[in-house]
């Protein structure tokens, strides 16, 4: 089950009480105080685990508390520190307290202290003085800290797929990555985001994210899109997947409406580097004319695709992709316009190299 938002209560442990005791030895009638200090309460940590990509483990477990410190002992023995509470979360988890961002947990294996445990109380040995040789007082341990927090998951991926329902995003990610999403010939097959690892060669690869299809009004809460648009906010490059075979809505209109929804949701998201994939090109007779017209619409110089062993359709590759220059993360024009077919794997192998090269 994919869960990307939960509310939990976290609490550090209470400090253990100090001990009231006196030294008892043979031939010593009134030994001095030897009460030990209480142990500190356990701390609460968040730890990032790369082996999970959901917050589902928190369903049904609302309270997460560290252990209390142990009481001090006799003979100046300090109590044991309370056991820490380690809360494991996937990369990309944001922790909100009082509706304000408190922690942003991104790096795998990162461990961040959230709450410090209460200090253990001092034993009566600390309170001996010239006028008080037999103190019968020891401190209580300090209380721990309790906090109600909201965990929000924003998946971390290099490439984010954006498109209308049934555009072929799930088929594409299943073709070029290790992801195995549900695929069917109807809209809204994808109900949760999918992450896939794309292996380009033995040394190179990247992460791709596919979110449920966006519909008009997604930025205002319609459909499933707004719930998951946040999962592509961290991506480095967006790939608009357009259905070239669709008769009721042309590729220019698809692109314009998708971009409008992104701009409404987040201007920063809409300004990310991007490319365009003209999917289902194998069932379109005039794909070259369609690509030529679309490139003109984006003010791009159409070209015959030859690099990366692409099929020789008309399309566009930014000069950065076919040179040794590094990509500009602030590039505003499209990085690529590629006809492909996810079903027949047409240009999908070459797409891996194009996307890898497109990453800043």
UniProtKB/Swiss-Prot annotation:
GO cellular component: cytoplasm
GO MF annotations in UniProt: GTP binding; GTPase activity; magnesium ion binding
Annotated binding of GTP, by residue: 163-170, 188-192, 210-213, 279-282, 341-343
Binding positions for Mg(2+) per the UniProt entry: 170, 190
Cross-referenced SUPFAM superfamilies: Obg GTP-binding protein N-terminal domain (SSF82051), P-loop containing nucleoside triphosphate hydrolases (SSF52540)
Cofactor dependency: Mg(2+)
Compartment annotation: Cytoplasm
Subunit structure: Monomer.
Function according to Swiss-Prot or TrEMBL: An essential GTPase which binds GTP, GDP and possibly (p)ppGpp with moderate affinity, with high nucleotide exchange rates and a fairly low GTP hydrolysis rate. Plays a role in control of the cell cycle, stress response, ribosome biogenesis and in those bacteria that undergo differentiation, in morphogenesis control.
Protein name stated in the entry: GTPase Obg
Name of the gene this protein is made from: obg
